[in-house]
């Protein structure tokens, strides 16, 4: 079905291109409301594409009225919001019914159609460049000047008929589906005897002409009686300024009302999810680019945080005040109703949308939005599902990294974050451990003083409490993946705590020796991680290494023998890596304990060792 705007559907007898635009937008509204968006998307896009951009700017009409501007502004805003609303309803129905692939595919197709139409409409609303506006007006008035056309001819007809003007055929070239607007307008004006003006026929380039009502320019009505060159230039400049200011005003009003919901729609389709497909991902990216450029921003983080540039774009739009406080707050107003404590699980897309938006908000603007960022993040962390816990910790880590520590300590926010993370230390899920430990360490740096500072007597603090829980978990853990996850992040705690690690030395050494004695597969991941723990302990607690040197040397030598004589499925690369890490540990012990390590290594080399790997490692220790 192809849509045409005719006299029967729109009162265009007293209107111009803006009336055609209003008719197009009303038709889109009707089709979206009836649920025919997917079926009629192509036709609706063609209607928008073929409409000249000048028709979307009331400022291009000489007889601009406030009512006309408000009508265009309201219908543009309502169409965009209705498109977004339909996608929200569709996605909510998918979640409620636990939809399968078919339902999600249908929603993805609907979202693609909605985002494509929103992008196209916003591109039409973007202000036209001033230079282009002047050229268009001059082209519309050029048919009245005899000095610039050698073959310009004027023919006068009966004064009772309505005047008409011959000019370019841009209407049919630019809008094939809406050319009936011009014909209907001409017929209506020819029947209007109130004008009582003589027809004027202008012929240009002999074979290239069309007819339009007198006084109606190609993109709107022109001031009557412009014949002198000087007055024509003055009108062009004044009308160009009026056109541009009105176009800018229209864009600002529409964007302020729709940028938040539009960004939320894009964010929900910015990553791969069950409710997205390749087309919706591309449409979301395209719409985000359109929103960014329309608001005068050079990147998405700038759009979310606010446009603070004093410069102007090529089309002259002042970008400083378009979205001065950023679109993140507007997007959160849209998301807030879906992220309440009782209802947020009904909208699985909302949590991913929030996380995506937060990830693109950078320092120092995250601090300004803490009231919007912190509650949803804590809500996710407190949930019993592992996926939501991980997502919440990721959000908290981004907040910690992008907010000044002093600002986090205001009103006890850092304490709240720590209290939310601390109970998770008792969890034994590898995926959670990998993301929890770095986040916990980051918040401890905010709320606790540096343990390495010696300005006052040291006391057990929250670093020590967290480490005690970690060591308790490690000491009795038998699951390989959990052991590896704990061992992977323990060196970070040791490096931060420094010499205060001495309070936990006995348990640490006991865990290190136990982990070195246990193989966890051909890759020996657990042993390699344990060797790095030992290196961190030696570096931070070197004054006490003499006490534990003998036990550690025995454990390292056993490890070398086990690797050299172990299963054949251990690759040479793994053997070499383990050997290098053992050499590093023995070298550090030698520097701490002096001749004790050297004497032990020398005695072993003099005993005619048969294992080449052990012998090479010991020789390297003496040389280092």
What do these predicted regions represent?
Residues 2-134, 238-294, 479-624:
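Alpha-solenoid helical-repeat scaffold
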Residues 247-258, 273-376, 385, 390-391, ...:
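Alpha-solenoid helical repeat scaffolds
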Residues 2-7, 11-25, 34, 57, ...:
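Charge-rich, low-complexity intrinsically disordered regions
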Residues 139-238:
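Long intrinsically disordered, low-complexity regions that are acidic and Ser/Thr-rich
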